[in-house]
Amino acid sequence: MSGGGTETPTGCEAPSGGGGGGGRKRDSLGTTSSPAHLIIKDLGEIHSRLLDHRPVIQGETRYFVKEFEEKRGLREMRALENLKNMIHETNEHTLPTCTETMEDSLSHVLQRLQAATASVCRLQQREQERKKVHNDHLIASEKQHIMQWEDFMKEQHSKQADVDEEHRKAMEKLKEQYAEMEKDLAKFSTF
């Protein structure tokens, strides 16, 4: 189908012209304007226009690419221009405003942070003092309990010694009493 338009008139001319010497016949047909030749030529043009779309498609493709590149280039130029304007606006107005606001806010924040730090240091110091007093009290209380315990243990030992002494005396008394009772029993058993 493609390329058939240029070959069709040549194929039609050869049978009508006869055998060898086709170059002369073609020249003679080309110079004479016979109706068959004109019809064949018109048929070739119609055939090539109807069936050979390469030139049209190539033209349309070139036009589309050209339009696309131009529009894309304009779009990209507009996007770059907008970006440049945004950067300029940011550098000239937004950035200094943000810097000033940040410096003002940070100075207030720094003051509040220093005040909070001082408060925390005071609270920590008070807590440490309270813990020290509490620990000192615990140590003194523990020492007092140890001394009381030692006194208690000494008292218990002395009481134990007293009780042991009383018990020993009571045992001796009981032994003497039982020894005497045995003597008395021995006297009565002789009766």
From Swiss-Prot:
Could you tell me which residues carry N-acetylserine?
A: S2
Q: What is this protein called?
A: Biogenesis of lysosome-related organelles complex 1 subunit 5
Question: What InterPro entries does UniProt report for this protein, alphabetically?
Answer: Bloc1s5 (IPR017243)
Q: Record the organism.
A: Sus scrofa
Q: Key word Coiled coil present in the record?
A: yes
An example GO CC term for this entry is: axon cytoplasm
Q: Which domain of life is it from?
A: Eukaryota
Q: Does the keyword NADP apply?
A: no
The UniProt subunit note reads as follows:
Component of the biogenesis of lysosome-related organelles complex 1 (BLOC-1) composed of BLOC1S1, BLOC1S2, BLOC1S3, BLOC1S4, BLOC1S5, BLOC1S6, DTNBP1/BLOC1S7 and SNAPIN/BLOC1S8. Octamer composed of one copy each BLOC1S1, BLOC1S2, BLOC1S3, BLOC1S4, BLOC1S5, BLOC1S6, DTNBP1/BLOC1S7 and SNAPIN/BLOC1S8. The BLOC-1 complex associates with the AP-3 protein complex and membrane protein cargos. Interacts with BLOC1S4, BLOC1S6, DTNBP1/BLOC1S7 and PI4K2A.
Return one Gene Ontology term, BP aspect: anterograde axonal transport
Residue ranges the record marks as coiled coil = 160-191
Q: What is the organism lineage in this UniProt record?
A: Eukaryota, Metazoa, Chordata, Craniata, Vertebrata
The UniProt similarity line reads: Belongs to the BLOC1S5 family.
Q: Where is this region: Disordered?
A: 1-32
Q: What does this protein do?
A: Component of the BLOC-1 complex, a complex that is required for normal biogenesis of lysosome-related organelles (LRO), such as platelet dense granules and melanosomes. In concert with the AP-3 complex, the BLOC-1 complex is required to target membrane protein cargos into vesicles assembled at cell bodies for delivery into neurites and nerve terminals. The BLOC-1 complex, in association with SNARE proteins, is also proposed to be involved in neurite extension. Plays a role in intracellular vesicle trafficking.
Give UniProt keywords alphabetically: Acetylation, Coiled coil
